[in-house]
Amino acid sequence: MNAREAYEKSLWNSLPEKLRKEIEKCVEHGYMETYFFRSNYPDLFKNKFNIVQILKDLGYFAKIKTINFQDEEDTKLEISWNN
């Protein structure tokens, strides 16, 4: 394993396990994106900007959006990638 691969593995392992498993499952099934809402996964949003930066460093497209759904506000973490 070269230095870049070791760095990427370290970054990947620094992400919450729940997030890693969801991305792996989506890739396995051929999906090109996934998303998480703060209301369902509040622990993912504790360091949300750190998570977005790690995902970007790993080559994913990630962004945080505030959305309104049925008069309630929520925050959404969107993640997409190219295979």
Labelled PLM ranges:
Residues 1-43:
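An N-terminal amphipathic alpha-helical segment
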Residues 43-66:
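Short, charge-rich amphipathic interface segments used for partner binding and complex assembly
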Residues 61-83:
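C-terminal edge-of-domain segments
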